[in-house]
Amino acid sequence: MNTVQILVVILITTALSFLVFQLWYYAENYEYILRYNDTYSNLQFARSANINFDDLTVFDPNDNVFNVEEKWRCASTNNNIFYAVSTFGFLSTESTGINLTYTNSRDCIIDLFSRIIKIVYDPCTVETSNDCRLLRLLMANTS
């Protein structure tokens, strides 16, 4: 045998030994690995098979806003109508009125944190309008 063959045999033997030791270590700790996976499986990220699932941790419109008044939030009136509000105004489907109202806070939050392009309606261009008074009331109740 020449030196090249000896080196190849040593390399293959080392690789197989390493593989055997890894498999042995895995088999020895199999119960611990299963317990670990059961304990911490809720912390791992997984894609959902549900098409309608919105991962609210991925997109947050408040990530780059540092002023508390400018952060978007869901606020409700006394009659349980929810609005997505900020000092910029209301989220709406058009820029001429409040067209997005919600019957529960969950729907408001899902719509607020979705990636859909949103239109902001600023009612306070006319300071005396009813919509501007509603916005100020909602902002006073949530800040």
From Swiss-Prot:
This is Envelope protein A28 homolog. Residues 22-143 are virion surface. GO terms for biological process: membrane fusion involved in viral entry into host cell; symbiont entry into host cell. GO terms for cellular component: membrane; viral envelope; virion membrane. It comes from Amsacta moorei entomopoxvirus. It is a single-pass type II membrane protein. Keywords: Disulfide bond, Fusion of virus membrane with host membrane, Late protein, Membrane, Signal-anchor, Transmembrane, Transmembrane helix, Viral envelope protein, Viral penetration into host cytoplasm, Virion, Virus entry into host cell. InterPro entries: Poxvirus_A28. The chain crosses the membrane at residues 1-21. It holds the Pfam family Pox_A28. It is found in: Virion membrane. Contains two intramolecular disulfide bonds. They are created by the viral disulfide bond formation pathway, a poxvirus-specific pathway that operates on the cytoplasmic side of the MV membranes. Belongs to the poxviridae A28 protein family. Envelope protein required for virus entry into host cell and for cell-cell fusion (syncytium formation).
